[in-house]
Structures are given as structure tokens and as C-alpha cells.
């Protein structure tokens, strides 16, 4: 187990009250959170979303990506179903960090795509480790999930970490003139299942 649970509290949102759980990585003290809505029922697959941190999309409403819209869609869907979990995965910029993400944005402004920009900076296309999320599911005694994702890598890593995914539910964001190239790159180079 790479994480320990630190605390939980009520988090009122526009979609209702969630419980917010705080976790800490044992090796480096990095924090992660999970938002739980409603009751977790043993042996019943729960709707789940792993949302990777994206300050630019989540807090500043950037149109370069689909992150902020996906966060809102996931919280709304979880609340409308009556229960679910959203893990806020603190691995900004596909785990290259905020400042490197800004450098990658600058390279994208010069014509590189999101994968090429990461590689130019010395990173792989996706540096994230979703095994931390499996630890959160295990700490909260969640064994079976219905996963809101377009990312087959996320599905594979969770299954390899012992989480049973009974259904993959797409979370599709409409293209706009700012994110169309980014979404196309995610589909073509990273295998994301973005189009109906």
C-alpha cells in the first residue's frame, strides 16, 4: 500500500454533498483526494472517475483540453446516479508537473502536438501511475467499478492492480477550435476512445 488515509470531511458542491477523503503517499508526502457521493455498497459495482489534476482546465477553464468539462460531467453524473467516487489524481500534466506542462504548451504553440511536446521535454507521452488509485479503491473497500474514462491505459493499469472493471463508460467532450488537435492526438497517438 503506497498511501495512507489522513482525514475525511463533508464537501458541499452544486451537485450535492460529497465526502472528501484525503490521502498521503508514504514515500514523498504527496496528497491525493477522493470524493464519494452516497453509500458505497459492498459487491455492487460503483460509478467511478479517476480525474488527473489539471490546474489549467479545472481551475482556469482552459479550452486547450477536455479536463475541466470532464470533471464537471463526472461529478454531475455521479450525483445523478445517487452514488459514486471521483478520485482526483494529483499527477499534473500527465505527471510531468505544472511548469513542464506550461513548457509543453509553449511547444504546442509552436506547432508540436501534446505527445511530441512531452517527448521534446524528455518525457513519455503519459507518465502517470494509476496504481495509487487502486490503493484508494482498496482503502475504501471498493473492488468493482464502472469506470468513466476514454483511456484504455487507465483501464489496463487498474485491472493489473486488482480492480475489477465491469464497464467502461465513455466521457466525451465536444470538440472546439482550441481542443480539436489535442483530442485528435489523444485518439491517434495515445489510443483514447474519444469519438462515438
Swiss-Prot record:
Matches recorded under InterPro entries: GTP_cyclohydro_II, RibA, RibA-like_sf
Binding site for GTP: 49-53, 70, 92-94, 114, 149, 154
Enzyme class, spelled out: hydrolase
Catalytic activity field: GTP + 4 H2O = 2,5-diamino-6-hydroxy-4-(5-phosphoribosylamino)-pyrimidine + formate + 2 phosphate + 3 H(+)
Keyword match Cytoplasm: no
Keywords: GTP-binding, Hydrolase, Metal-binding, Nucleotide-binding, Riboflavin biosynthesis, Zinc
An example Gene Ontology CC term for this record: cytosol
NCBIfam families tied to this protein: PRK00393.1, ribA
Family of the protein in this entry: Belongs to the GTP cyclohydrolase II family.
Function recorded in the entry: Catalyzes the conversion of GTP to 2,5-diamino-6-ribosylamino-4(3H)-pyrimidinone 5'-phosphate (DARP), formate and pyrophosphate.
Assembly and interaction partners: Homodimer.
Full protein name: GTP cyclohydrolase-2
Organism encoding this protein: Buchnera aphidicola subsp. Schizaphis graminum (strain Sg)
Gene it is expressed from: ribA
Amino acid at each position: 500500500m503506497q498511501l495512507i488515509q489522513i482525514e475525511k470531511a463533508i464537501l458541499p458542491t452544486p451537485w450535492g454533498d460529497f465526502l472528501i477523503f484525503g490521502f498521503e503517499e508514504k514515500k514523498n508526502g504527496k496528497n491525493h483526494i477522493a470524493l464519494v457521493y452516497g453509500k458505497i455498497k459492498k459487491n455492487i459495482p460503483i460509478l467511478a472517475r479517476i480525474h488527473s489534476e489539471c490546474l489549467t482546465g479545472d481551475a482556469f477553464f482552459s479550452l486547450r483540453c477536455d479536463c475541466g468539462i470532464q470533471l464537471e460531467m463526472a461529478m454531475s453524473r455521479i450525483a445523478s446516479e445517487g452514488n459514486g467516487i471521483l478520485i482526483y489524481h494529483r499527477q499534473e500534466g500527465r505527471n510531468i508537473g505544472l511548469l513542464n506542462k506550461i513548457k509543453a504548451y509553449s511547444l504546442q504553440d509552436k506547432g508540436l502536438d501534446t505527445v511530441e511536446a512531452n517527448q521534446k521535454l524528455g518525457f513519455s507521452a503519459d507518465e502517470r501511475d494509476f496504481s495509487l488509485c487502486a490503493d484508494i479503491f482498496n482503502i475504501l473497500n471498493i473492488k468493482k467499478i464502472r469506470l468513466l474514462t476514454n483511456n484504455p491505459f487507465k483501464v489496463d493499469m487498474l485491472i493489473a492492480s486488482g480492480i475489477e472493471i465491469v464497464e467502461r463508460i465513455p466521457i466525451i467532450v465536444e470538440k472546439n477550435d482550441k481542443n480539436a488537435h489535442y483530442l485528435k492526438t489523444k485518439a491517434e497517438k495515445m489510443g483514447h476512445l474519444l469519438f462515438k
